[in-house]
Each structure stands twice: as C-alpha cells, then as structure tokens.
Curated annotation (Swiss-Prot):
Origin species: Homo sapiens
Cytoplasmic side: 1-7
Upper classification of the organism: Eukaryota, Metazoa, Chordata, Craniata, Vertebrata
Subunit structure as annotated in this protein's UniProt entry: Interacts with SLC35A3.
Tissues of expression: Widely expressed. Strongly overexpressed in pancreatic cancer.
InterPro entries referenced in this protein's UniProt entry, alphabetically: Glyco_transf_54 (IPR006759), MGAT4_A/B/C_C (IPR056576)
Protein name: Alpha-1,3-mannosyl-glycoprotein 4-beta-N-acetylglucosaminyltransferase B
C-alpha cells in the first residue's frame, strides 16, 4: 500500500514536471515567434526603403543626364561656331524643346542660367526673341559684322547719312566680306515700317546683295520700364533710356554673333574714314595674342568697338545681369575688371592688366557727328579729337571758271574753295532768287554734272527747290546747221528771262544728270533757288565733267 502510494506520488510529480516543462517550452516558443515577426517586419520595411532610394537614385540620374546633355549641346554649338557653322542663332532659342525643362519648377533639377532668367517676361510670348522685322539675305560667314542700333529722334535722323558714309568707303571685295545690320530699336510698327521702306528705297542693291540687313525687335522683347529704380543721380527718363540701350545692344549682338568672325559696334550718327574696314581687320589679325577682348577704333562711347564673335555670349550675359543698374560703357569696364584685376593690387596695376584686353587704335576711324541725342531734349557735341581732318567730298577736277554767288558766306567756307576741292561752301539761309554761278573762262561742252548739298556733320543744311540751269554760247560764227540744232533742242527746256535753260533740279539734297550735247558749248552753269529756305546751306561736292 505504502509502495503503491509512493509510485503514485512519483508519477504525479513526473506529470507535473512534464506539464510545467511543456508550458515553459510553449511559452518560450511563443516569445520567439513574436521576435521573428518583428524582424521580418523590419526587413520588409528596409527593403521598401531601399527600393524607394533606388527609384529616387534612378530619377536623379536621369535628371543629371539631362543636365549633362544640355552642357554637351552648349559645348558642341560653341565648337560649331568656332569651326564656322553659324546657322544657329539666339533667335531660335525659344524653338528648342530641350529648353522647356529649365523653364518649369522642378524640385531636384539643376537650373542653368539662360536669357529667360534675366528677362523672365520673355516666356510670356514665344516670339519675344524673334525679330518683328527682318529684311535682307541673311548673309553669314563674313569677316566683319557691323551693328547699328537706331532709335527715333525728335529733331533729325542721321541714319541714312551714316549708311551712305559706311557703304561708300567699302571696296567691292569688302562689300562681299561684311554685313551691316541696322536695328530699328522701336516697337511702333508704323515707324519701323517707314524707316525700313526708306532704307530699301535708298539702298536696294545693298539689300539684294546681302551687305545690308534691317531688323527690329518684337514688341514683347522689352520689359516694363516703369518699375526701374533711379540710380547714380539719373532721373527716371535717363535710367529708362540707358536701360533700353543696354537691351538694344544685347539684341544686336545675339542676332549678329553667328554671322562672322568679328563684330563691330557702331552708332547711327557717325562718319567713317576711307579703308576703315580693311584697317580694322588687319589690326585684329596683327595682334600678337588672342587674349584681347576689345579693339577700339574710336575713343567715344560705344562707337567703333570690335569684339570676337565667340566672346559675344559672355558679353551679352554680363550685360543682361546688370542691364538695369549701369550704362553700357561702365559695364564693359567691369567685365575687364572681373577678368584681370586683382583686388589686392592698386588701380595702376589694374589699368595695366586691362590694357592687355582693351587695345586702342589711332587715329580714330569713326567720328561722331550727331548733335541731337536719342535721349529726348539732349544736345551733345561730342567730337573725337583723334579722328583728324576728314575729306568729306570726293576728288574731282573742275574746268576753269569764275565762281560767284548772292549768298552770304559763313566764315572761311567760300565757294572758291569748294570749287577747287579745298573745302566745302557754307552760307547763311538762302532766299528765293539767290543763285550760285560758274562762268567758264572759255565756252566748253559739258558731259554731266553732280552737286551734293549738306554733309555728314550737317546733313540738314541742304538745298531745297533749287534748279540747275545752263547758258548756251550763242556764237554767230558757229556752223549754221549746228546752231539750228541747238536752238531746236533748247525748245524742250524751260527758259529763264535772262536766257538760262533748266536742265535739272535738287532732290533730297542732290542734283545730277547728263547735259544734252545739242546745247553745244556753254558759257555758264547756275544753281537758282526758287523759294526761301528754313536752314543754312552747304555745298559739299561740285563736279562738272567736260565732254571729250
């Protein structure tokens, strides 16, 4: 009985231990299961984060590839321009779909600076960088491109006189190796159309050949000038004028940069010296180093400044960064300062360094002749002292004659000197009935005549409503048949009371034509003024060609 009870107790104790062991194991197994679940969840979360990081990395890699492609494109275009491929212009910038990513707001994209960052209003219109007017043949591949900005002036425009001077001093070879680009920097379509048509009428050959081009900016190119702040003591109107002027220069440079090797900045109120183009080109080619940035052919303002076309992008970008802040001549000097001046050195050292980039040619090749500035109400009589004396008329040999006039001569500018090609004739305001007469010492036959009034420095001093008249030599001993032929011919021409026959008249300050051989020998030629003139008069060129 006692043994049976002990066996029972032993069995009971064993079962209890087994139960406790199973319970402990079960509890321990349940705890381990919870830990495994935790680790599994963490591994899954880590895997998701790694996947997201991989996707973000791929996204950024694509965006960086876009940036790299844009940089490669810019480098290739610059190299293409260097190699002579000048077909791409800044005017096509808005047409490039690859530019669109830089115009939007992307969170993780590197934003490259473009013209739109400095002129964000251009994004409002796709045509903002396209010329509103473009006349010409689009010539490229030349040595020299000349840019002339022109704006409306209240008193007098010098543009056509400037073009006459520039074109007349070019040789046939130079006309084939250059382009003159006129920027009519106005948004009034009627005004730009009128100026364009006038240029086309006066220079049809140059337009057709590709020598001369006329452009004007889009009305959407300019920003709102009413928000400009005054600076350096300049009133708002002057700040607006100089700000717009900076943008005009940029537009011209952007248009011209792909057309040639060199770009020369000019103004619309200048006169040029003979052989100016070859002189500039040779001076550039003779530079011992390519480090130069500006070659100056005039000491005044922004006249006669030559740049390498490859440098125009840098210059335009710099001007656009500060176009609202300072005038163009200051900005040009700042570009040189940034490139070569050491802030730890003195001003003299800086000037020496800048002199290596900005090289002056003497004597000056261009003279400023305008007196009425493009800034309303401003009179400026700037003259380049290094220009020297310029022969403003072509050389001719006139037949011997006695010259006389009823006009009152101004100072030493006599009619005799003009006839002998020593100077021009300048007189006070003509009145109706005044005359200029050339009486030949011996009667002679004339083949043709040419008179030009006004000159590049005083283009408004012209002859208006003035006729050209000749007096035939009536010799009773002459051949009767020839005499009869001459009398018959004279019936076709208006005759004055004193026997002079009208054979021509002045148009836009010029009178030219051929002399009818039937007149025979002539005693005299006369310029007769028919009406009162509002201005003084200059006779800058006199050419009387004898018949062979």
């Amino acid at each position: 009985m006692r043994l049976r009870n002990g066996t029972f107790l032993t069995l009971l104790l064993f079962c209890l231990c087994a139960f406790l062991s199973l319970s402990w194991y079960a509890a321990l197994s349940g705890q381990k299961g919870d830990v495994v679940d935790v680790y599994q969840r963490e591994f899954l979360a880590l895997r998701d984060r790694l996947h997201a990081a991989e996707q973000e990395s791929l996204k950024r890699s694509k965006e960086l590839n876009l940036v790299l492609d844009e940089i490669k494109r810019a480098v290739s275009e610059r190299q293409a321009l260097r190699d002579g491929d000048g077909n791409r212009t800044w005017g096509r910038l808005t047409e490039d779909p690859r530019l669109k990513p830089w115009n939007g707001s992307h969170r993780h994209v590197l934003h490259l600076p473009t013209v739109f960052h400095h002129l964000p209003h251009l994004l409002a219109k796709e045509s903002s960088l396209q010329p509103a007017v473009r006349v010409g043949q689009g010539r490229t591949g030349v040595s020299v491109v000349m840019g002339i900005p022109s704006v409306r002036r209240e008193v007098h425009s010098y543009l056509t006189d400037t073009l006459h001077s520039l074109i007349s001093e070019l040789s046939p070879q130079e006309k084939e190796d250059s382009v003159i680009v006129v920027l009519i920097a106005e948004t009034d379509s009627q005004y730009t159309s009128a100026v364009t048509e006038n240029i086309k009428a006066l220079f049809p050959t140059e337009i057709h050949s590709g020598l001369l081009e006329v452009i004007s900016p889009s009305p959407h190119f300019y920003p709102d000038f009413s928000r400009l702040r005054e600076s350096f003591g300049d009133p708002k109107e002057r700040v607006r004028w100089r700000t717009k002027q900076n943008l005009d220069y940029c537009f011209l440079m952007m248009y011209a940069q792909s057309k040639g090797i060199y770009y020369v900045q000019l103004e619309d109120d200048i006169v040029a010296k003979p052989n100016y183009l070859s002189t500039m080109k040779n001076f550039a080619l003779q530079q011992p180093s390519e480090d130069w940035m500006i070659l100056e052919f005039s000491q005044l303002g922004f006249i006669g400044k030559m740049f390498k076309s490859l440098d125009l992008s840098l210059i335009v970008e710099f001007i656009l960064m500060f176009y609202r802040d300072k005038p163009i001549d200051w900005l040009l000097d700042h570009i040189l300062w940034v490139k070569v001046c050491n802030p730890e050195k003195d001003a003299k050292h800086c000037d020496r360094q800048k002199a290596n980039l900005r090289i002056r040619f003497k004597p000056s090749l261009f003279q400023h002749v305008g007196t009425h500035s493009s800034l309303a109400g401003k009179i400026q009589k700037l003259k380049d002292k290094d220009f020297g004396k310029q022969a403003l008329r072509k050389e001719h040999v006139n037949p011997p004659a006695e010259v006389s006039t009823s006009l009152k001569t101004y100072q030493h500018f006599t009619l005799e000197k003009a006839y002998l090609r020593e100077d021009f004739f300048w007189a006070f305001t003509p009145a109706a009935g005044d005359f200029i007469r050339f009486r030949f010492f011996q009667p002679l036959r004339l083949e043709r005549f040419f008179f030009r009034s006004g000159n590049i420095e005083h283009p408004e001093d012209k002859l208006f409503n003035t006729s050209v008249e000749v007096l035939p030599f009536d010799n009773p001993q002459s051949d009767k048949e020839a005499l009869q032929e001459g009398r018959t011919a004279t019936l076709r021409y208006p005759r004055s009371p004193d026997g002079y026959l009208q054979i021509g008249s002045f148009y836009k300050g010029v009178a030219e034509g051929e002399v009818d051989p039937a007149f025979g020998p002539l005693e005299a030629l006369r310029l007769s003024i028919q009406t009162d003139s509002p201005v003084w008069v200059i006779l800058s060129e006199i050419f009387l060609k004898k018949a062979d």
